[in-house]
Amino acid sequence: MSSLRLLADDLTGALDTSAELVGKFGPLEVCWSIASIAPAQPSFSIDSGTRERAADDAFAIVQKLAPRLAGATTAYKKIDSLLRGHWAAELDACWQTGLWDVCILAPAFAYQGRRTLDGQQYARGADGRWSAVGKNLVEQLHDRKLDARRARPADGLRPGINVFDGEADNDLDWAVKAGENYSGRVLWCGSGGLASALARGADVWVSDKLKSPVLGVFGSDNRATALQLDACGDVVIPSGDVAGDIDRIKQALDKGVAFVRLEAPDAHSRDDVARHFAREISRLSRLIDPPGSLVVAGGETVKAQMIAVEARALRPLGRLEPGIPKSVIEGGNWSGVEVVSKSGAFGATNVWAKLLKQNGLL
């Protein structure tokens, strides 16, 4: 039986990539603690929590986790399609284990406007223009003394890290074919685009129906999230003090939906913001009953929410669209609550407004 073990640097990335793969590999749990994974569990995804860590810390954490990927028919290192975090250091940590003969690196994700040309990652902006993201992928790997080269269809896979270009979905299909035809041990490394190619043909669509009441929790400072919430009008409740705003939040939930936009006006650093948001999310979770559905953006926000309700794992059901998975909370005070999540940097301006309108909530 085929199995999947996936390692991501943040929770939304683990969820959206796992959601692409449940049709191929069956149910799996996404965890944020190694203790939540049973030793004999054939398939799982884990968030290393390293997106915001220093590069050396990220390397050390991933080096300890990477051996847990061994033994699966598909080992997958998920990286961000915008190359946020320390993707090269984390791939280095995986590669140094010696558990794989080749690595297929293909971070393109056409649906999200990310492509790779001549080993260079590009992102499409809201104005339709393409801009380079970071240094050339091969150069970044060479900076870490890794054996990496651009892959070409005629050459086949070579030992080391093979970097695949990609502009459209079928470009990633030939990367998948190369890996599936290889007789040795393969480490797959990419975003949701490569995951979708691995599971091409599997049905992972799920209904966009939300269970009432709907609670939204948003802590991402990404401009995309701000614009998406602006489009939702009066259902959004800005709050730097959940306890002080709880009556308004409860009244909104009684009407069907409350989108809480967390604020930290007195914070002086990202760490201060993260600690403040975690405290506010914990307070909110104690002051309200479990919602019917939870909508959340940003990996650290999702994790803070799961820790606050003492969840053990999230189980992806599939996705509303690429990059927007629907999952179910496993364990804890909110067990059984459905969660719609996404990266803070992803999505059209109307992504949440459209979802609420489809459910008669806006």
Where is each model-derived feature located?
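Residues that scaffold, gate, or flank divalent-cation-dependent active/transport sites
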Residues: S18-G26, I34-A35
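A structural-propensity feature for long, helix-poor, extended segments
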Residues: P39-G49, V328-L362
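Redox- and metal-dependent alpha/beta enzyme cores, enriched for Fe-S-associated oxidoreductases
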Residues: V206-L284
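Short hydrophobic/aromatic-enriched beta-strand-loop microsegments
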Residues: P27-V30, W188, V236-S239, R312-E321
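Active-site histidine-anchored catalytic micro-motif
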Residues: K77-K135, P290-P291, V296-G299, K303-T349
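Cap/lid and interdomain-hinge subdomains that line or gate substrate/regulatory clefts
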Residues: M1-R5, L28-A35, P42, R53-F59, ...
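Short beta-strand segments
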Residues: L7, S45-D47, K77-K78, I104-A108, ...
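Short glycine/serine/threonine-rich phosphate/pyrophosphate-binding segments
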Residues: A14-D16, H86-W87, A197, T225, ...
